[in-house]
Amino acid sequence: MSITAERKQALIKDFGAKDGDTGSPEVQVAILTERITNLTGHFKSHHKDNHSRRGLLKLVSQRRSLLDYLKKKDEGRYKSLIERLGIRR
């Protein structure tokens, strides 16, 4: 369910401004999106797992907050990020 260290490093490299950039909103949103995608697949076969569903809702809320922050700071970066990630927002 969790993402591997290699996948996380690939996301950091793809979405970060420089190598090792883990704090930028783009990287954080990309990692959260990956985790949300994995959990969504988990619920296809474990539909009664309400404990993990609460965790999913927290992740979605955290991603929404980061996207709102990014939209407020720089709308161009926000639009390019949701296009790259395929988030319909």
From Swiss-Prot:
Q: Could you name the domain of life of the organism this protein comes from?
A: Bacteria
Example of a GO biological process term:
translation
Q: What is this protein called?
A: Small ribosomal subunit protein uS15
Q: What does this protein do?
A: One of the primary rRNA binding proteins, it binds directly to 16S rRNA where it helps nucleate assembly of the platform of the 30S subunit by binding and bridging several RNA helices of the 16S rRNA.
> Subunit comment for this entry?
Part of the 30S ribosomal subunit. Forms a bridge to the 50S subunit in the 70S ribosome, contacting the 23S rRNA.
State the family named in the UniProt similarity comment for this chain: Belongs to the universal ribosomal protein uS15 family.
- Molecular function GO terms recorded: rRNA binding; structural constituent of ribosome
Q: Which CDD domains match?
A: Ribosomal_S15p_S13e
Q: Does the record bear Aminoacyl-tRNA synthetase in its keywords?
A: no
- One GO cellular component from the entry? cytosolic small ribosomal subunit
Q: Where is the signal peptide?
A: none
Record carries keyword Oxidoreductase: no
NCBIfam families, from UniProt? S15_bact
Which Pfam family, an example, fits this chain? Ribosomal_S15
Source organism per UniProt:
Xanthobacter autotrophicus (strain ATCC BAA-1158 / Py2)
Q: Which UniProt keywords apply?
A: Ribonucleoprotein, Ribosomal protein, RNA-binding, rRNA-binding
For this protein, the record's PROSITE patterns field holds:
RIBOSOMAL_S15
